[in-house]
């Protein structure tokens, strides 16, 4: 009996000691656990990747957040290229037109995806902005003067550098990996005009979200010359709205006679903002003339591709 009591006493002390050590261990390990959690939250916020992948990155990089972020981007790029290859045959007819103006220059791009849901995603819209910025930067390196119009294909754009360093092709693959849809940089046009020329622009079906760029389902640019009575901005916007609504396919001449509703030449068409006049008549009133125009509709077939 005495032996049994002694055994119970010893056992109680052992259990108490183990519990004390366990509690002390928990308290001493809490600071490091908190630090890991803080790093995890920081990495998740800065990259947008899943908690699982962020945790894996921190473990692989010994909690070095800079290395972990680089590792995540590299893995995402690899996975994006792999996914892009698998998805490239799928139809991508949704997306956005991006339009950017700067001084006497303008850029309009079309980036396609599979669904309207992805087109409204912030990461997709950031890609559209990056493509427009890259095309604008590429255009600014030209040493040509006067009126410059450049049409870029998907292949042309893939060779450009993205604003933050990597190629646009890598940026595209990264976005495909994140969003899981086929995405394509379809086409772009850049314009640069002399100081006495002007560019009018219009975006229809506007989508808000990014600063410094207009986005929507349709976009138009009009190059014109003159000092209109109503001001260059007002006339430029009206002309671009007309091009958007009437979809002309050629410019025509100032003295062309209209063929009515079936007219596809810009100048003889009835002027959409003021139907009392043809486009040519309205330009004459404003002492201006149109030199060129471009119209993009998201998902349309195009001879410019």
Swiss-Prot record:
This is Elongation factor Ts, mitochondrial. Keywords: Elongation factor, Mitochondrion, Protein biosynthesis. One of its GO terms (cellular component) is mitochondrion. It comes from the Eukaryota. Its main location: mitochondrion. This protein may be expected to contain an N-terminal transit peptide but none has been predicted. One of its GO terms (molecular function) is translation elongation factor activity. Belongs to the EF-Ts family. GO terms for biological process: mitochondrial translational elongation. Associates with the EF-Tu.GDP complex and induces the exchange of GDP to GTP. It remains bound to the aminoacyl-tRNA.EF-Tu.GTP complex up to the GTP hydrolysis stage on the ribosome. It is found in: Mitochondrion. It holds the Pfam family EF_TS. The gene is tsfm.
């Amino acid at each position: 009996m005495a032996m049994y009591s002694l055994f119970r006493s010893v056992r109680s002390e052992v259990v108490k000691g183990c519990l004390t050590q366990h509690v002390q261990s928990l308290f001493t390990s809490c600071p490091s656990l908190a630090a890991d959690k803080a790093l995890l939250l920081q990495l998740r916020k800065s990259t947008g990747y899943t908690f699982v992948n962020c945790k894996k990155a921190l473990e692989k990089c010994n909690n070095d957040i800079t290395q972990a972020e680089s590792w995540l981007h590299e893995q995402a790029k690899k996975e994006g290229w792999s996914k892009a290859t698998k998805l490239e045959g799928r139809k991508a007819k949704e997306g956005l037109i991006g339009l950017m103006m700067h001084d006497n220059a303008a850029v309009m791009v079309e980036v396609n995806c599979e669904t309207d849901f992805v087109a409204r995603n912030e990461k997709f819209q950031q890609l559209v902005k990056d493509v427009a910025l890259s095309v604008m930067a590429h255009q600014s390196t030209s040493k040509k003067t006067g009126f410059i119009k450049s049409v870029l294909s998907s292949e042309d754009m893939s060779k450009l550098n993205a604003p933050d360093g990597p190629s646009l092709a890598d940026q595209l693959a990264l976005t495909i990996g994140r969003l899981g849809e086929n995405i394509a940089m379809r086409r772009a046009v850049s314009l640069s005009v002399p100081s006495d020329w002007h560019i009018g622009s219009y975006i229809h079906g506007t989508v808000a979200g990014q600063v410094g760029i207009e986005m929507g389902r349709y976009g138009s640019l009009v190059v014109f010359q003159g000092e209109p009575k109503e001001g260059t901005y007002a006339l430029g916007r009206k002309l671009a709205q007309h091009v958007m609504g009437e979809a002309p396919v050629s410019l025509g001449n100032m003295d062309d006679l209209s063929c009515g509703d079936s007219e596809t030449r810009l100048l003889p068409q009835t002027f959409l903002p003021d139907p009392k006049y043809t486009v040519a008549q309205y330009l004459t009133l404003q002492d201006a003339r149109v030199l060129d125009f471009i119209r993009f509709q998201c998902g349309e077939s195009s001879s410019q591709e």
